[in-house]
Amino acid sequence: MPVNIRIPTPLRKLTHDEEVVETSAENIGQAIADLEARYPGIQERLLDESGEVRRFVNVYVNEEDIRFLDNKDTAIKDGDEVSIIPAIAGG
């Protein structure tokens, strides 16, 4: 059973409208690299110039924010669900 990555609506144009993408990556960094290999351009939407997750992008593994875990080194395993959630500003 692979890891499922839930793709937010604004990024689905890069994943050919796929809402859920499967990966066999072992951590978040590898999962993002896997997404980039399959869907060029998605990584620049998720990572900043220093290679860290952009501050307005939230990534969760089984509903836990990776910023409170090991960031991109957060381990993932078969059956986990990764959610990418862009922050929304308003006013």
Whereabouts are the PLM-identified features?
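Ubiquitin-like/PB1-type beta-grasp interaction modules and other compact soluble beta-rich domains
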Residues: 1-90
